[in-house]
């Protein structure tokens, strides 16, 4: 939902007609694991299977590729929330499904649990990069708005406040996953949030 793994098998010498989504997925995984500053162009060549000239031609420089991965993450997360809202499950089951997908995604990564690319990497770069900051703000607003929409549709009278609590827990789960928290700890925190909101 918010961060499902984009891991793919690495391929070298990818043909000219490469799949843009697949390449962005591979780049997302590398950035998610190593962060923006910690990811080199050689890392991206290794992850995507594209050589530097092809990467530059398709996406521009490293920063432009990073921004494209953030845009893709926002779009994919929004789509996941839309599907959850459309499923029309009761409030408790909706929240349980949301957190289950989130925890599953956060526990994936190239070298171990990597959390959410937005929370784990863009928050650092947002301080001095206006475009990254704008994307992070858009992501946070999208999360707040979609979870509020979900809760309003289920009749929650405190939907706005509860949505912000849920978003805060989602971000905490990302940090805890990167810190090595076991699945049981993440699931317990998610269950506490569900109980707080759904009663």
Where are these regions (language model features)?
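Amphipathic alpha-helical packing segments from all-alpha helical-bundle domains
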Residues: 78, 93-100, 128-154, 161-164, ...
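Hydrophobic alpha-helical connector segments
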Residues: 68, 82-114, 163-166
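Hydrophobic alpha-helical segments that form the core
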Residues: 4, 101, 114-123, 158-176, ...
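Short, basic, alpha-helical segments at the C-terminal edge of helix-turn-helix-like DNA-binding modules
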Residues: 71-77
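Helix-turn-helix
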Residues: 22, 26, 30-64, 68
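Short helix-capping/turn signature of helix-turn-helix
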Residues: 59, 120-128
């Amino acid at each position: 939902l918010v961060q499902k793994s984009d891991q793919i098998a690495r391929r070298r010498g990818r043909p000219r007609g490469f799949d843009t989504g697949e390449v962005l997925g591979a780049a997302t995984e590398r950035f998610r694991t190593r962060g923006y500053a910690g990811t080199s162009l050689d890392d991206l060549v290794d992850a995507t299977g594209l050589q530097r000239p092809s990467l530059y031609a398709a996406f521009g420089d490293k920063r432009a590729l990073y921004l494209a991965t953030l845009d893709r993450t926002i779009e994919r997360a929004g789509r996941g929330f839309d599907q959850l809202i459309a499923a029309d499950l009761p409030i408790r089951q909706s929240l349980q499904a949301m957190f289950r997908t989130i925890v599953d995604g956060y526990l994936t990564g190239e070298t171990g649990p990597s959390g959410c690319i937005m929370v784990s990497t863009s928050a650092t770069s947002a301080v001095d990069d206006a475009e990254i900051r704008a994307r992070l703000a858009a992501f946070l607003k999208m999360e707040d708005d979609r979870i509020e929409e979900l809760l309003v549709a289920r009749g929650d009278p405190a939907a706005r406040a509860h949505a912000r609590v849920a978003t805060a827990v989602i971000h905490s789960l990302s940090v805890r996953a990167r810190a090595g928290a076991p699945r049981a700890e993440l699931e317990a925190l998610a269950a506490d949030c569900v109980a707080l909101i759904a009663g």
